[in-house]
Regions:
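FIC/Doc superfamily catalytic core
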Residues: 1-192, 196-362
């Protein structure tokens, strides 16, 4: 990443963290929904973020949207949930794993192909067995015979980078994620869903590195595709990675500006006694699961495994979704290493507000 971009990005990330934007209630969930919505919109979906939020949270399909659009978004949501699991567990990237991601992305909308070289099913994540082009009369992607060996080369490259991700600065993590996106979509391992899977892998790298996951904005689709095409024709990722860095910087800048503007307004959960005094709005968010988590933490600093053991939980996914994530989103629990959420040394403790709530409900 160019030095000017690097400096600007680091300043914005520092400001993002200082303001606590990522620690807002429901920020992580709603930001993920935005990422999913923009990714499917690039592929033609017209479902909005608001419609996806209602569909994901309440199971209510958006009126006036096709079944295919609904399924595309639901499939991608399941794929991102799987990616979050992989990032949290630091699972090694393998060909079966990438195929599993593709299978989730295409689960309900994938086609079955019968070719001279055999049969393959998009819904199963099968690699393509025929050649494809970007568009009618457009450039052709890698010959299908080369897809599997080149994908394995990509996997080896990516695992080598992920092995050192804890020692990387944030701009370097983003660089790796952009490069991963470029390499995978250029190989084009599947007949369909390559863009969604490539963006998912990009976000997986970002999640594993503990930086803010990036949405590729659908309103910049033309510029995004143009940057990708120019880089592919040039045989270097420089143009594409530069474009992605500029998009990230612009998105973060807008987020910070909007937050600072909105923060000037009164915030419902604050009162005259300060932010560490629980109000009805805060205590109403303390589910039985969150209450158990607060009691288990007390004055201690514990890692996720220790917390699960104290709570008698074996399901890591349920623990994260029903206990830990809700407590963090509510501002009741914080990470000891907030700039590296996926760090192996990560531990959790009560915030000042969490201590007050624990005392109030104890």
């Amino acid at each position: 990443m160019e030095e000017r971009r690097r400096i600007r990005l680091e300043r914005l990330l520092d400001e993002f963290d200082r303001l606590g934007i990522g620690r807002q209630i429901n920020y992580g969930r709603l930001h993920l929904y935005s990422i999913i919505t923009h990714s499917t919109a690039i592929e033609g979906s017209t479902v909005t973020v608001e419609e996806n939020t209602v569909m994901f949270d309440n199971g209510l399909p958006p009126i006036g949207r096709s079944v295919t659009e609904q399924l595309m978004n639901l499939d991608l949501k399941r794929a991102y949930e799987a990616a979050e699991e992989v990032a949290a567990a630091r699972t090694e990237i393998t060909l079966p794993l990438l195929k599993a991601f593709s299978s989730l992305v295409m689960r309900n909308i994938g086609a079955l192909y019968r070719t001279l070289h055999g049969e393959y099913d998009e819904a199963k994540g099968d690699l393509r067995l025929q050649n494809v082009s970007a568009e009618r009369g457009g450039r052709s992607y890698l010959s299908w015979e080369k897809v599997e060996p080149r994908t394995n080369d990509f996997i080896a490259w990516l695992n080598e980078r992920l092995a050192n991700i804890d020692s990387m600065a944030a701009p370097d993590i983003y660089d790796v994620s952009f490069e991963a996106h470029f390499r995978l979509v250029t190989i084009h391992p599947w007949s369909d869903g390559n863009g969604r899977v490539a963006r998912l892998v990009m976000n997986l790298v970002q999640m594993e590195g503990g930086v803010v996951p990036m949405a590729v904005r659908s309103d910049h689709k033309v510029q995004y595709i143009e940057a990708l095409r120019e880089s592919q024709e040039a045989g270097t990722s420089e143009r594409f990675c530069g474009f992605m860095a500029d998009e990230l910087i612009d998105a973060l800048s807008q987020t910070v500006e909007e937050y600072e503007r909105d923060a000037e307004r009164d915030v419902p959960w604050l009162n005259d006694d300060g932010p560490n005094v629980p109000t009805p709005q805060v205590t109403s968010q303390v589910t039985p699961q969150v209450r158990r988590l607060l009691a288990a933490l007390g004055s201690k600093e514990l890692d996720a495994r220790e917390l699960r053991s104290m709570l008698g939980l074996s399901d890591a996914k349920s623990f994260r979704q029903l206990y830990l994530r809700r407590a963090i989103d509510a501002g009741l629990v914080e990470m000891t290493i907030p700039d590296k959420p996926r760090s192996r040394n990560q531990r959790y403790r009560l915030t000042g507000l969490g201590m007050k709530v624990n005392e109030t409900l104890g």
